[in-house]
Swiss-Prot record:
TPR repeats lie at residues 272-305, 383-416, 1218-1251. This is SET and MYND domain-containing protein DDB_G0284059. Residues 1-35, 111-167, 601-642, 659-726, 854-905, 1039-1079 are annotated as: Disordered. It comes from Dictyostelium discoideum. Zn(2+) 1 binds at C533, C536, C555, C559. InterPro entries: SET-MYND_domain_protein, SET_dom, SET_dom_sf, TPR-like_helical_dom_sf, TPR_rpt, Znf_MYND.
Length: 1280
């Protein structure tokens, strides 16, 4: 039952404003309640639900409730149903399920008090689900007083809050804020350039002397001897021995402190307390990601301060001799300093947890709260930790654990502060009404509680979990060294030219897991030391640090302990390892791993065997066995019993929580369908609807939650409409699983036994890695000189730390180190990561805006200094000049502001993630696959774990091929051949290169008469493809020249850099030492002009290009070739100008559409329909159509794009294709084409389940699609 109350006009306005501003600020909670009959009057009525105590507002008989940010799917379906009545019965079904999903959500943000009549006294009042302020006692002094004056977090005035939410996101973060964030991230990255602390003049002199000395030497041993003489001479002459050895012997903390003094510093106190206080200030500004960075740094510095204090105390004890009163006081001081300050540590963990809750990262928030609780015995923030962990458990649907934490917090909070008491009682009330089944871990916990309620089972369970994390042994780590490979994969040695290959010994169907392999050695890229786990390479928001060096960071105690046993225990505190290059670090870890494996394999054997092993290794170094084939272990593993783990996507925003899984236990319910009133924050146009639920709008870990988009001018005024009331009944148990959770089995492993047959296990061995071809003869003199120099420095380091690292004495040799350095240039895998580029995009756009504003201001100043007549003449002259300059108008000087376009980077509708190399690894077994520009395998990374699957069916005897980077789907033939030769030292002769395939096949302009079938018919156009003639010798020469030019440029840039003035490498760096990097230039994800890397063909010699048709043999050269090339360049320029004007400047005029259509017309006349260049224009036209509210045209161009991609790929096994299908389904859903939408969503979900990458976009999209599919399923169930 519901009870009605009357509101005054002023009160109703307050309520409406507050409801508008609850979008995105509250947290979603799952409920089920019944509505009584609605009064369809013209007044404003407040309704209090008797079951949940929720305050519901009615305007003209329609519900106005606080819909959490992201429930735009519900609004989409409502708008569809209102405007498309032609769908008949399915209309009511979708509408009914929409009301169910929306009515079960409650917002925890407090609304203004209303005058209640006969309100139930037992109903709890709504309070804030999360305390939006950091711990009160830890705030800066200037902020403590306002917080003490209020008993609970206050909400800004309604009008002020509305204005705040309506402004675009970029107005919340101005250019200064983004500059600060970039500076902060760069300073906290702990990124010291390789060997940057060497004296610059010494390093330059060494490199120049090396290059000159070995330029005419061909023998490798002679080069090494010459470099050794120069190296030793320069060390003695320049007295640089002290500088080199000081770096080798330095500690990690010492190098970080030294480097920090000469890099960017901030105006606050550089202590743990200073960083924590600055984090509190940013938290008050709701910059949660920035605050979290500072809290992390505060925790790291706190550990360093403890270590420094302990070292200082020990020195004092030694000086005082430990006797008398002085020694006793020193001991007391040591005890005081070494004891962690619980209040500081607990407040840091509590604040980090609160940031994670506001970022809606509930799983990480629960872990962080547990860390704080483990440190705290009894503290003023203990109740907050329990309270916030309860919130995290509640949103993770672990209601039993949430209830326990809320009860603990309730008990503690009664003794201290009652600010959160109402919210805790509200949560407990909700959990009581939601009788949901317990999850597996909760059932175990409940059984323990029932056995002995008086025992400390929680503490025992936590201790057992910690013991399991700590109990990491060498044997458990060695188990990961075994690679799991399908038994149908066979390794052979084909020839000296081809080398080793992997071949299918039997038929292998598509989507079969072929390889599962952990890296033999790996390391993070230095630019991402502060963002990823050192062990598993997964992104972390709240890291924990090594207590000894305070540098290595991990996502959990398990990773910390595992890495400590595996490698960090030997490397901890050695400063040289954080400044050497990643190639040098991999070589050091490779030799250390070899020594560890050797000692494990030779336990209990005689002492003479190491000498025999040394002799064998020396022989293998002189004559490496390039034909070595690894043999499988005797036993096989049934993959049906050991299926690969497929990670479930987790929600990162509240937008995808339909909340029907939290329905109450009654089997039937009754609901009344109504149409909600369109408010200022509800998207009412096609562009806003798609922008608010854009599938590429992922909430990043490093940016605060996006605010609802402001309405366009056409939808600024609110409107309301009502429909006929429909009553229905349904079985709630059938809708209970509508929301996805971690327990839902969405990714069922295929049951086809052919996909999971027997698998062989291969032990990762150093012998296989040592057999890789080092390509000594292919490395240039410059690169060889640099590697020899690095080898001597590494040798010097290993001589000093041989025992600590456990490296065999025979491996401390320049020749061994140099061999591995040369090998790793071609056999290193680059592990991809996805970086949020929102800040850089907004910053560049803001800079463009500032430049435009400055130009306008200058023009206004000039005009104000002139007479009115002259001013009018000047304006007319300017208009005429603008009309005569097509490059400025209408493309650049658009009247539309940049935020008017829904695909502007300011509107969160562009692809926010770009791919970059976050780490490097060596996978021995996967390295045996050869390259093809049209590969038949697909790589998937889970952190640093590698899985390789068959992309499509592989026949018996067919070679299993990977892709080293350049792909025929993306890159032209010339670019592929040059890049592969420069990076991997071979001329590609794969099928795609032999057939001269590329992303842009050119039509044959010729025609012929079909005299055999129809002698009198008109000429028929030739269906062949124009293939360009390529001289391989000239191409190799061009590749060598290009490589030399690049090395000269790099050398010049290094000379121009000042000492210690080094910034992190750009995201689009040209370092391509990776194995599979085949998504960098993706045509389907080029919605960002700053990230766009279009590889247009370079036509330096227009007249001497030679083409020949593959079918009719017609030839094009001379003027014809020049004309063809000119038309291609014109179409490229038209497309680039139109695309940048649309995305960068927000120009949505008809002129832009005309320009894109003209470019499309030119490209259609030149290229075949499957051309990538044609697909790029289809993608741009679909974006343009959405921004112009033309959904039908957007769907048309998107379908053409999908057809273009499928015809070019030859299959549909692509995550990019799945994203395009998801966009198409979203557009059809907005247009009311329910059947087409459901079909597109089904295809997108099917593709992404099998072929999703580790891009966060894929998980976000897949989560949205699965929710929508379940919504359609629920609608069909209701219809039955």
């Amino acid at each position: 039952m519901t009870k009605k109350i009357k509101l005054s006009n002023s009160e109703s306005n307050k309520v409406n404003n507050n409801n508008n501003n609850n979008h995105g600020n509250g947290h979603n909670h799952n409920h089920s309640h019944n509505h009584g009959e609605m009064c369809h009057g013209h007044g404003i009525i407040g309704i209090v639900d008797s079951v949940t105590g929720e305050n519901i507002i009615q305007v003209n008989g329609e519900n106005l409730r606080s819909v959490p940010n992201g429930h735009s799917l519900i609004h989409n379906i409502n708008s569809i149903i209102n405007s498309h009545s032609k769908h008949g019965k399915i209309k009511n079904i979708l509408k009914d399920s929409t009301i169910i999903s929306s009515s079960i959500n409650l917002s925890d943000k407090p609304i203004n008090k209303i005058t209640e009549e006969n309100s139930p006294p037992s109903s709890p009042t709504l309070s804030s689900s999360t305390n939006t302020t950091t711990d009160r006692q830890e705030l800066p002094q200037q902020q403590q007083q306002p917080q003490q004056q209020q008993s609970q977090p206050s909400t800004p005035p309604p009008q002020q809050q509305t204005n705040q939410k309506q402004q675009p996101e970029f107005n919340r973060y101005q250019a200064n804020d983004i500059l600060f964030r970039n500076k902060l991230t760069r300073s906290l990255s702990r990124n010291i350039p390789p060997l940057s602390l060497l004296k610059q003049n010494f390093k330059d002199e060494m490199e120049n002397s090396f290059h000159t000395a070995i330029s005419n030497i061909k023998d490798l041993n002679e080069k090494v001897e010459m470099v050794n003489l120069i190296f030793q001479h320069n060390l003695s002459e320049n007295n640089a021995m002290v500088n080199v050895d000081s770096i080798i012997h330095s500690s990690t903390s010492g190098l970080l402190s030294e480097y920090k003094q000469i890099t960017e510093t901030f105006d606050w106190e550089q202590t743990s307390k200073g960083y924590k206080n600055k984090g509190n200030e940013l938290f008050q500004k709701k910059q949660y990601s920035d605050a979290l960075l500072l809290y992390n740094e505060s925790l790291r510095i706190y550990d360093m301060e403890l270590a420094a204090a302990a070292t200082s105390t020990n020195l004092n004890e030694k000086e005082n001799g430990g006797g008398g009163n002085v020694g006793g006081s020193a001991t007391a001081t040591a005890t005081t300093i070494n004891t962690p300050d619980v209040s500081i540590l607990s407040s840091i963990h509590s604040n980090r947890c609160l940031c994670l809750v506001n970022l809606e990262r509930y799983k990480e928030g629960a872990i962080e709260a547990t860390r704080g609780i483990d440190l705290v015995g009894s503290s003023s923030v203990l109740h907050k930790l329990y309270y916030r962990r309860g919130i995290c458990y509640y949103h993770l649907r672990k209601h039993y654990k949430a209830k326990k934490d809320f009860l603990r917090a309730h008990t503690l909070i009664e003794k201290r502060d009652s600010s959160d008491l109402a919210s805790i009682e509200n949560y407990l009330f909700k959990i009581q009404k939601l009788s949901l089944p317990l999850q597996k871990d909760e059932e175990i916990e409940q059984e323990l509680d029932n056995k002995n309620n008086n025992s400390n089972d929680d503490e025992k369970q936590q201790q057992q979990q910690q013991q399991q994390d700590i109990d990491v042994t060498i044997s458990s780590i060695l188990e990961k060294s075994e690679s799991l490979i399908d038994s149908r994969v066979e390794f052979l040695y084909q020839s000296d030219l081809v080398g080793r290959i992997s071949e299918a010994s039997d038929f292998i169907p598509s989507n079969t897991v072929l390889y599962q392999e952990e890296p033999y050695v790996s390391c993070l890229d230095r630019n991402y030391h502060s963002q990823y786990c050192y062990n598993c390479f997964k992104e972390i928001l709240s890291p924990i640090y090594c207590k000894e060096c305070s540098n290595s960071q991990y996502c959990s105690n398990k990773c910390l302990n595992e890495d400590y046993v595996k490698q960090h225990g030997r490397e901890c505190g050695k400063g040289f390892l954080i400044i050497c290059s990643h190639e040098s670090l991999l070589v050091i870890r490779l030799l250390a791993r070899k020594g560890r494996d050797y000692r494990e394999a030779n336990k209990g054997k005689k002492e003479e065997e190491p000498q025999q092993q040394q002799q064998k290794q020396q022989k293998s170094r002189k004559l490496p066995n390039l034909t070595f084939i690894p043999k499988p272990n005797p036993t096989q593993i049934d993959q049906n019993l050991n299926k690969p783990k497929i990670v479930l996507p987790e929600p990162t925003t509240a937008a995808i929580n339909t909340a029907l899984s939290s329905a109450s236990t009654p089997t039937t319910a009754t609901a009344t369908t109504t149409t909600t009133t369109t408010t200022a924050t509800t998207p009412t146009t096609l562009a806003e609807t798609l922008s608010s639920t854009s599938l590429t709008e992922n909430k990043s870990d490093s940016t605060p939650p996006p605010t609802p988009l402001p309405p366009s001018s056409s939808s600024s005024s609110s409107s309301s409409s009502s429909t006929t009331t429909t009553t229905f009944s349904f079985n709630m148990s059938e809708l209970q699983n509508l929301q996805i959770s971690q327990d839902d089995e969405l990714f069922d492993v295929p049951t086809d036994p052919a996909l999971f047959g027997k698998s062989n296990t291969y032990s990762q061995s150093y012998e296989l890695i040592n057999s890789f071809n080092p390509h000594f003869e292919h490395h240039s003199n410059d690169s060889m000189a640099n590697m020899i120099f690095d080898a001597f420095v590494i040798e010097r380091f290993l001589l000093y730390y041989q025992k600590d690292l456990g490296i065999l004495s025979e491996d401390i040799d320049v020749h061994v180190i140099l061999r591995h350095l040369c090998q790793l240039t071609t056999y290193t895998f680059a592990i991809p990561g996805y970086i949020d580029n929102h800040d850089s995009l907004v910053l560049k756009t803001l800079q463009l805006q500032q430049q435009q504003q400055q130009q306008q201001q200058q023009q206004q100043n000039q005009q104000s200094n002139q007479q009115p007549n002259q001013q009018s003449n000047q304006q007319s002259n300017q208009q005429s000049n603008q009309q005569s300059q097509p490059n400025q108008s209408p493309i650049i000087q658009s009247q539309n502001p940049p935020h008017a376009s829904p695909f502007s980077p300011l509107r969160y509708s562009v692809q926010k993630y770009s791919q970059d190399k976050i780490g490097y690894a060596v996978y021995p077994m996967a390295s045996l696959m050869n390259h093809s520009c049209d590969n038949n395998t697909h790589l998937q990374y889970d952190g640093c774990s590698l899985t390789i699957k068959s992309l499509f069916n592989i026949e018996k005897g067919e070679e299993i091929l990977g892709c080293y980077g350049p792909h025929a789907f993306l890159n032209p033939l010339k670019d592929r051949l040059i890049n592969l030769y420069n990076e991997f030292f071979f001329v590609c002769r794969c099928k795609a290169c032999s057939e001269k395939s590329g992303p842009d096949p050119i039509k044959c302009p010729g025609s012929y008469h079909d005299h055999l079938n129809s002698p009198e018919s008109s000429p028929v156009e030739c269906s062949g493809t124009l293939l360009e003639s390529i001289n391989m010798n000239q191409l190799v020469t061009m590749a060598k020249l290009q490589q030399q030019q690049q090395q000269q440029q790099q050398h010049q840039q290094q000379n121009d850099k000042k000492k210690f003035n080094s910034n992190p490498t750009n995201l689009g760096s040209n370092n391509n030492n990776n194995y599979l990097n085949n998504n960098f230039n993706n045509p389907l994800r080029n919605g960002n002009p700053f990230l766009l890397k279009q590889t247009y063909d370079r036509y330096d010699d227009h007249e001497h290009r030679y083409f020949c048709c593959s079918k009719c043999g017609i030839e094009l050269n001379g003027f014809d070739s020049f004309s063809l090339t000119s038309q291609i360049i014109i179409s490229d320029n038209l497309f680039e100008m139109g695309f940048k004007a649309m995305t960068l400047y927000g120009n949505l005029s008809k002129d832009i559409e005309t320009m894109l259509l003209r470019a499309l017309e030119l490209r259609k006349s030149i290229f075949k329909p499957c051309s990538k260049k044609i697909g790029d224009i289809y993608d741009s036209l679909s974006r343009f159509s959405i921004s112009r509210e033309d959904g039908a045209s957007a769907a048309k161009y998107l379908e053409l794009l999908i057809e273009n991609v499928i015809s070019r790929l030859g299959h549909s096994n692509s995550a990019d294709l799945g994203r395009e299908y998801s966009k198409l389904g979203q557009i059809y859903l907005t247009l009311g084409e329910i059947e087409k939408s459901e079909d597109a969503i089904e295809k997108a979900e099917s593709i992404l389940m099998s072929w999703k990458s580790n891009d966060p976009t894929d998980e976000e999209v897949l989560f949205l699609l699965t929710n929508r599919r379940k919504l359609f399923t629920a609608a069909h169930l209701i219809n039955k």
